[in-house]
């Protein structure tokens, strides 16, 4: 079996080496692992890149070749005990109690043996009463540490070493009990299971909101208890090659979800849609629908907050691949008013509907088109809007001056054929200078 496994590993290593060599030949002369980065950055066609963070929040990372891992874990024993699984924790604590009883049982047996309590004719004043074998010494250690006190075995005043051993075992037993109880309570109060009632939508959507392309996903809290100081974060992970030729397998880029405006802090009583505006600072600024389908990245979303019952911080994670970003979709409403109350229907939590007329181009192209349209609109006017208003105001003032002159002439009167002075009828005219 060992030889077959070794052969399989060797063949796998050779195959991987051949594939890497073939990739380097296709890419041409480039930088290799000893300082040169591979030329291709995008994943091969037809190959799906594995998730860095799974949908349930677990990180798809495995640590290998760690030097001194056991010593590092033992140096932080309490955290190690809290992080391990329950079965290993119970096994560790059972072995700890058993080792403690065996250790002090051996100490009691040695004290009794050195005093001569195990001899055929027992001494008149033994160190321990009714302790004549190792099994009896083990039972005495168990009864002492657990405070069972059956009333048969006991320590006498004959041996000070025996009294000191009993005192030492009581202290060690208290310390061990405190450690075990603290670790168990910390593990039980760990807010890890709170994440089971915090959910993310299965897909994220890209649609227009307030005339801007936005990336949106939904979060919800299934419990009636609130998540205190809840806030969201997001990061985009993708491979990148720097201008210096350094290849970064997973480059972390922050995705703005309203940190500056405070919209990243949410009141998670009902499901909320998190919005990322795709602007010039967004890593998705140059991606349209077609480019998004061919992109190679992973969007990691994080929800953090304090559990209301324990005030302990919890973190819920999920991720979205490009295939899980639905372009031109919106989420169905989940909050409805029923009488004097609001009702949340989680049947619609993951559902989306298509929005006709959503542009398929990138946000950058939309901004360029809007800028071109504004330039063409401005070029159609010979002057600015201020100049246009000023010309109309000037024409209106001139018209008012003409009216005043006419009123003066009207006061003097104009003679008619019969010699009577008749008033002059004036028709004011507003001269507006309109742009061509």
UniProtKB/Swiss-Prot annotation:
UniProt entry tagged with the keyword Ion transport: yes
Keywords assigned by UniProt, alphabetized: Ion channel, Ion transport, Membrane, Potassium, Potassium transport, S-nitrosylation, Transmembrane, Transmembrane helix, Transport, Voltage-gated channel
Cytoplasmic side: 1-83, 188-436
Keyword Transmembrane on entry: yes
Activity regulation, per record: Channel activity is regulated by variations of cytosolic pH; channels are activated by alkaline and inhibited by acidic pH values. Inhibited by Ba(2+) and Cs(+) in a voltage-dependent manner; sensitivity to those inhibitors is lower than in other Kir channels.
GO biological processes: potassium ion import across plasma membrane; regulation of monoatomic ion transmembrane transport
Localization terms from the record: Membrane
Top-rank lineage group of the source organism: Eukaryota
Coiled coil: none
Biased composition (Acidic residues): 400-418
Tissue specificity field: Expressed preferentially in retina.
Reactions catalysed according to its record: K(+)(in) = K(+)(out)
Molecular function in Gene Ontology: inward rectifier potassium channel activity
Motif Selectivity filter: positions: 147-152
Region of interest: Disordered: 14-43, 400-436
InterPro entries xref list: Ig_E-set, IRK_C, K_chnl_inward-rec_Kir, K_chnl_inward-rec_Kir_cyto, Kir_TM
Free-text function comment from the UniProt entry: Inward rectifier potassium channels are characterized by a greater tendency to allow potassium to flow into the cell rather than out of it. Their voltage dependence is regulated by the concentration of extracellular potassium; as external potassium is raised, the voltage range of the channel opening shifts to more positive voltages.
Record-stated family: Belongs to the inward rectifier-type potassium channel (TC 1.A.2.1) family. KCNJ14 subfamily.
Name of the featured protein: ATP-sensitive inward rectifier potassium channel 14
